[in-house]
Curated annotation (Swiss-Prot):
It catalyses: RNA(n) + a ribonucleoside 5'-triphosphate = RNA(n+1) + diphosphate. Belongs to the RNA polymerase beta chain family. SUPFAM superfamilies: beta and beta-prime subunits of DNA dependent RNA-polymerase. GO terms for molecular function: DNA binding; DNA-directed RNA polymerase activity; ribonucleoside binding. Its EC number is 2.7.7.6. This is DNA-directed RNA polymerase subunit beta. DNA-dependent RNA polymerase catalyzes the transcription of DNA into RNA using the four ribonucleoside triphosphates as substrates. Disulfide bonds: none annotated. One of its GO terms (biological process) is DNA-templated transcription. In plastids the minimal PEP RNA polymerase catalytic core is composed of four subunits: alpha, beta, beta', and beta''. When a (nuclear-encoded) sigma factor is associated with the core the holoenzyme is formed, which can initiate transcription. It comes from Porphyra purpurea (Red seaweed). PANTHER family: DNA-DIRECTED RNA POLYMERASE I SUBUNIT 2 (PTHR20856).
Length: 1143
């Protein structure tokens, strides 16, 4: 078994190869293919011809390194140059003498005629390299740097081009057979047999044409159709109804077999373009451009392969447009399904019918769009510009291609801001597979069938890892051992089995979902003996999408490992088989949210993939050479190789990630140490000795404690705070621009008006905060002043200023200050100016960026979780002496609610914590591969009990393992010293601190900004907004009859502007708060109704001096609150006025 496991570890591919291989394909083949397809362009007079030589394209070395691109907000890209040739053809018209010569010549010779009429002199120019655009280059970690931020292009899973047959039932319960011919680019064709038995062809889902008419239109004669169809009579009989009803109207014939090619073409054209006059050449051209023109229609290599395979054709894979044979064979297959019940229907959710488009293909499609735009611009320039003045430089404009690529990387749904919270998040993001995006599904319309698990997902797409919510099932993750082949289909490895014996001698065989269908495949947790024979009489296998059983001799293949079914993040969960799938899903997703800790610790209980994931994520530094360490510091490591050369490795120190977490690399080698190729030299964020370390091993107790762990809340010890067990560093970025305004430039300065010296204590002489300073909320980071407007200045003042210069101009303080609820240490200050050669936006003279690091200890309100979906919020931090303690006096670190286990069915956490306890006492770490039942029934329980017994014997502490209740022990109350009534489950669990920190969420507002229109307080923490009082809250107050509280909340505390100011004055002066007035939102409602033409106003009853009560209109818009005499609601216009109103 040891040999088999070591073999399997070698079989895990590089987990980021899907990104790197795809981009490599794009550079070697994809870009060449799309450039080669660029046509030779001539002007209308054929005097000028442009030719691109795509195969010889060159890429210039990137202008900036990866580090420079990140720090300067640039794109890490290379310039693409393509050799191009512009050929001019000077055409001389024939002279009179030449005309005489022509008449005496034999006019039948076209060649002589042509050569005499025109004399063409070609001016040949040398090929010149022309710049056509920038291409963002992938970093060695599989990411792109675009405008200084790290982005990832996620993989898209879409319907594969090809032909798919399906059977539906219409509203009357009758069967409809149809076939969809999907192209990579161009129109879709659908063949269908309706309930009446008629065969139709739909073009782009709308236009319906009779199948026989369409076959004639594409150039097939009657004999060819007869030969190509095994059931020709079925086609003719199916068209009888059409012949009688419609054919007579269209061309005046009753027999469909009498239709000529030209008539068929005109019928098809009239269906597609009903309002345009039809002619045969136009119809022919239209049909050609729709299905047979390589520029507009493309099946792709995959589509051609799938159609050939389905219909049994031998058309070359380079022929990527439709052929008449394809259409004829498609109809023949459809008739056979309907008439003979032969042939197979297709399942569109089967992974054999869905393919993955990775970064290379997505980029290729975007380049194709950009080159099409470029072609159109070149043609326009050739038509408009003077031919003699045209040259390569002003003919080929790189802007369309640059814009197309920028649009893709900047705004495509598949180009995403990389999740850099920790290495697992980073790796998972690169291996993500999305069914959304252009050409994919819409999450609002995607049904259950698309999202559901499919048997073909086994070993290809993880059944566990997917988001919760609207994207569930539409976004998945590639399984650990899966890879994508050249056609984009996902493959997974299997060992062949011969007569019940597994062949481990050769490399495993990779199979796609289609190829796997015809074999009996056993899972990876089937027991195999020393001679490599499968043990057991009945073996569970997958065969033709079904889960069945068979005998060992009939097994064709066996999976290489139990973990090949699941993704990289899920494979980090020990005892996964004991967890409910929903909780495992949460565990996988929450590992990606774990914050890198200041002191990371590798787990006692792992799965064996921790090192592999840490290495492939690119977070740790790997040695490229063998040799000896000759230099180590916090910033770099020097390795002297066998040739005596020193290779330096620079380490990342306190870098800010995309999610504001801290990336810091620490050396783990020492001077004089011998190094081999591939050895880990330095740890990064969330790694410990080259292994993933997302959290800490802490002592847990499953017991209730004074109700503080109600509803999954956690009770933790002060030790976790004081010993910085869960302390993390977060780095925030603050930036300010110094702009050129109409009134003059803004200035970065220490001389800020109306600011005390104490506020300037951390600024240098230029007004920028000194690196290393401690700053709190409201402190000035960068001093900046902006010129004020001079509208209120007298003319003589302006004249004096113009004469004597700007001595005492008015300025406004616009300094960059640290926002509310933030504090920390300034770790870096970067100044960008044009003088230094930095590229800045137009109108900006300088930009200053300040990085502030914050040390966050764990506190009440922070979210923690285990690896099994057991998440909760910290409800209280207890002193160490009050925590429950063990028999040897050790206080526990965290108290969890035992009620969180049975209903959630994530028992894996209990196995993990008990084995972790044994590991802690034995000073051992365990690697547990999931699905261990092949080693015997209840293997997990047996292992845990055995190791607890060993720990009990080794430490001579009998209380560690109790036969009466294994895994439980007596625990004492820290406050009283009394033992608790019942034994408690105690263990050492691996707990994570998640990125949902209370510091980022807690928020309060006294005064703050208001909305311009409604004058209500803004919402949200970022806007320093207020707490929303919604309709349900109003109902609650109404239920208690709290009328005055409601009035206050809806007016003074919300949008009654006048009452707001009056209330503030009253509070300041100690007077009673006046009555509220009309809310601003009511006035907005009135104006909206009036804008709709409704005569609406507010009236009140008023008692006049003569004792009469009359309604008076209230003018809400004026502050004076004057009353106006009420108008009649319905004023009748006189006839003259009415006519004047109309005209």
């Amino acid at each position: 078994m040891v040999q088999r496991i070591s073999l399997k570890n070698k079989l895990l591919p590089d987990l980021v190869e899907i990104q790197r291989d795809s981009f490599k394909w794009f550079l070697l083949e994809g870009l060449t293919e799309v450039l080669e397809f660029f046509p030779n362009i001539s002007d209308p007079t054929s005097r000028l011809e442009l030719q691109l030589f795509g195969k010889e394209y060159k890429i210039k070395f990137p202008r900036y390194s990866v580090r420079q691109a990140k720090s300067r907000d640039r794109t890490y890209s290379a310039q693409i140059y393509v050799p191009a040739k512009l050929t001019r053809k000077d055409i001389d018209l024939p002279s009179k003498d030449q005309n005489k010569t022509i008449k005496s010549l034999d006019l039948s010779s076209n060649h002589l005629q042509f050569s005499a009429e025109k004399q063409i002199k070609n001016k040949k120019y040398k090929k010149r390299l022309v710049f056509i655009g920038d291409l963002p280059i992938m970093t060695n970690r599989g990411t792109f740097i675009v405008s200084g931020t790290e982005r990832v292009i996620i993989n898209q899973i879409i319907r594969s081009p090809g032909i798919y047959y399906k059977q539906d039932i219409d509203k009357n319960g009758k069967q409809i057979y149809s076939a969809s011919l999907i192209s990579n680019r161009g129109s879709w064709l659908k063949f269908e047999i309706d309930p009446k038995g008629e065969i139709w062809i739909r073009i782009d889902k709308t236009h319906k044409v009779n199948a026989y008419i369409f076959l004639r239109a594409i150039g097939l004669n009657k004999n060819e159709i007869q030969k190509g169809l095994s059931k020709y009579a079925f086609l003719i009989s199916a068209s009888q109804s059409y012949s009688v009803k419609e054919l007579a109207k269209e061309i005046g014939k009753n027999d469909i077999e009498e239709v000529t090619d030209e008539e068929a073409l005109l019928i098809v054209y009239s269906k597609l373009r009903p309002n345009e006059p039809a002619t045969v050449p136009v119809a022919k051209q239209m049909l050609y451009s729709r299905f047979f023109d390589p520029k507009r229609y493309d099946l792709g290599e995959v589509g051609r392969y799938k159609i050939n395979k389905k219909l049994g054709l031998n058309i070359p894979k380079t022929f990527r447009v439709l052929s008449p044979q394809d259409i004829l064979s498609s109809i023949d297959y459809l008739i056979n399904i309907k008439d003979k019940n032969s042939g197979n229907l297709d399942d569109i959710d089967h992974l054999g019918n869905r393919r993955v488009r990775s970064v290379g293909e997505l980029l290729q499609n975007q380049f194709r769009v950009g080159l099409n735009r470029l072609e159109r611009i070149i043609r326009e320039r050739m038509m408009i510009c003077d031919i003699d003045s045209l040259s390569l430089s002003n003919l080929i404009n790189p802007k369309p291609l640059i814009a197309s690529v920028r649009e893709f990387f900047g705004s495509s749904q598949l180009s995403q801001f990389m999740d850099q919270t920790n290495p697992v998040a980073e790796l998972t993001h690169k291996r993500r597979i999305s069914a959304l995006g252009p050409g994919g599904f819409n999450k609002d319309r995607a049904g259950f069938a698309v999202r559901d698990l499919h048997p073909s997902h086994y070993g290809r797409i993880c059944p566990i890892e997917t988001p919760e919510g609207p994207n569930a099932g539409l976004i998945g993750s590639l399984a650990t051992c899966a890879r994508v082949n050249i056609f984009g289909f996902i493959e997974t490895p299997f060992y062949p089995v011969h007569n019940g014996q597994v062949d481990y001698s050769n490399n495993p065989i990779y199979l796609t979902a289609d190829e796997e269908d015809d074999f009996r495949v056993a899972p990876g947790d089937v027991k195999v003996n020393v001679q490599n024979y499968i043990e057991g009489d009945i073996i569970p296998v997958r065969y033709r999408q079904e889960f069945v059983t068979t005998i060992p001799n009939q097994v064709d293949y066996i999976a290489i490992s139990p973990i090949q079914v699941i993704s990289a993040a899920t494979s980090l969960i020990p005892f996964l088989e004991h967890d409910d799938a929903n909780r495992a899903l949460m565990g996988s997703n929450m590992q990606r949210q774990a914050v890198p800790l200041l002191y990371p610790e590798k787990p006692i209980i792992g799965t064996g993939l921790e090192t592999k994931i840490a290495r492939d994520s690119g977070m740790v530094v790997i040695s490229r050479t063998s040799g000896c360490v000759n230099y180590v510091s916090a910033n770099k490591i020097g390795i002297q190789d066998n040739n005596g050369r020193t290779v330096l490795y620079r380490l990342k120190k306190y870098y800010r990630s995309n999610q504001d977490t801290c990336i810091n690399q620490r050396p783990i080698v020492w001077v004089g140490e011998k190094i081999v190729v591939g050895q880990t030299l330095a740890d990064g964020a969330s790694t410990d000795c080259g292994e993933i370390a997302l959290g800490r091993n802490i002592l847990v107790a499953y017991m209730p404690w004074e109700g503080y762990n109600y509803e999954d809340a956690f009770l933790i010890s002060e030790r976790l705070v004081y010993e910085d067990v869960y302390t993390s560093i977060h780095i925030e970025k603050y930036e300010v621009e110094c702009r050129q305004t109409k009134l003059g430039p803004e200035e970065i300065t220490r001389e800020i008006p109306n600011v005390s010296d104490h506020s300037l204590k951390d600024l240098d002489r230029n007004g920028i905060v000194v690196c290393g300073s401690w700053v709190e909320a409201g402190d000035i980071l960068v001093g900046k002043i902006t010129p004020k407007g001079e509208a209120d200045q007298l003319p003589e003042g302006k004249l004096l200023r113009a004469i004597f210069g700007e001595k005492a101009r008015d300025v406004r303080d616009t300094s960059l200050r640290l926002p509310n609820a933030a504090k920390g240490r300034v770790v870096n200050v970067r100044v960008f100016t044009r003088q230094k050669g930095d590229e800045l936006p137009p109108g900006t003279n300088a930009m200053i960026r300040v990085y502030v690091a914050q040390k966050r200890k764990i506190q009440v309100g922070d979210k923690m979780a285990g690896r099994h979906g057991n998440k909760g919020i910290i409800s209280r931090i207890l002193p160490k002496q009050d925590m429950p303690y063990l028999c040897d006096g050790t206080p526990v670190d965290i108290v969890l609610n035992p009620l969180g286990v049975p209903s959630r069915m994530n028992v894996g956490q209990v196995f993990e914590c008990l084995l972790g306890l044994a590991g802690g006492y034995l000073d051992k770490r365990f690697k547990i591969i999931p699905f261990d039942e092949m080693y015997g029934a209840e293997a997990s329980r047996a292992l845990v009990n055995r190791k607890l017994q060993e720990a009990s014997i080794l430490t001579k502490n009998k209380w560690i393992f109790n036969d009466q209740h294994p895994g439980k022990m007596q625990v004492f109350d820290g406050r009283t010293g009394e033992p608790f009534d019942n034994p408690v489950t105690i263990g050492r669990a691996y707990m994570l601190k998640l990125v949902h920190l209370v510091d980022d969420k807690i928020h309060a507002r006294s005064t703050g900004p208001y909305s311009l229109v409604t004058q209500q307080p803004l919402g949200g923490r970022a806007q320093h907004g207020g707490q929303r009082l919604g309709e349900m809250e109003v109902w609650a107050l109404e239920a208690f009859g709290a009328a005055y509280t409601l009035q206050e909340l809806l007016t003074v505390k919300s949008d009654d502007m006048q009452a707001r100011n009056e209330a503030l004055n009253a509070i300041v002066k100690g007077k009673p708060i006046p009555k509220p007035g009309t809310p601003e939102s009511f006035k907005v409602l009135m104006r909206e109704l009036q804008s709709l033409g409704l005569d609406i106003a507010v009236h009140k009853l008023k008692l006049f001096e003569n004792g009469q009560r009359r309604t008076v209109e209230v003018d809400l818009m004026s502050d004076s609150k004057e009353d106006r005499v009420a108008r009649s609601n319905y004023e009748v216009l006189p006839v003259d006025d009415f006519e004047q109103f109309l005209y």
